[in-house]
């Protein structure tokens, strides 16, 4: 478990943190099944994933609040980006977050526990350790407490990034680039 990991934050969808990550990584959250422990009507998973920083997920129960991200198979996960805005959300802003990973809900292990101080923008949580990506079927983000002892939480967006892998890395056949072979690449 890592406490108080290296966290960077910024505030727009076109900000440098997001652009730098998207150059070398791919957003894999779209392949997952998302669920939340509770939500106010009109502030659910759809708002958490709609790429609109004006909408948000709002919990509606006692803490801790959970966001569960389940992939159909084990994935290599590099970064988790969470967007919070203290200026807009005040006591709804999370201040203590736990990230757990595993294959199913019953074998989750805490990998990161971090405390945030008035976060405003994208919070980049690296999930690769010693140059090895986290490999998991399931991620769970737990909000343990909010600023100013708030009860419900607001999170505006979450993005999950994995390695960008080219298909050439998975083919077992060598590349044939000689003129003799290229003559037979197409049919007339």
From Swiss-Prot:
UniProt KW keywords: Cell cycle, Cell division, Mitosis, Nucleus, Ubl conjugation pathway
Tree of life domain: Eukaryota
Domain DOC: residue ranges: 4-187
PROSITE patterns assigned: DOC
Intracellular or extracellular location(s): Nucleus
GO biological process: anaphase-promoting complex-dependent catabolic process; cell division; protein K11-linked ubiquitination
Alphabetized Pfam families for the sequence: ANAPC10 (PF03256)
Assigned GO CC terms: anaphase-promoting complex
Oligomeric and partner information: The APC/C is composed of at least 13 subunits that stay tightly associated throughout the cell cycle: anapc1, anapc2, anapc3, anapc4, anapc5, anapc6, anapc7, anapc8, anapc10, anapc11, cdc20, cdc26 and cdh1.
UniProt-listed PANTHER family: ANAPHASE-PROMOTING COMPLEX 10, ANAPHASE-PROMOTING COMPLEX SUBUNIT 10
Stated name of the protein: Anaphase-promoting complex subunit 10
Highest classification ranks of the organism: Eukaryota, Amoebozoa, Evosea, Eumycetozoa, Dictyostelia
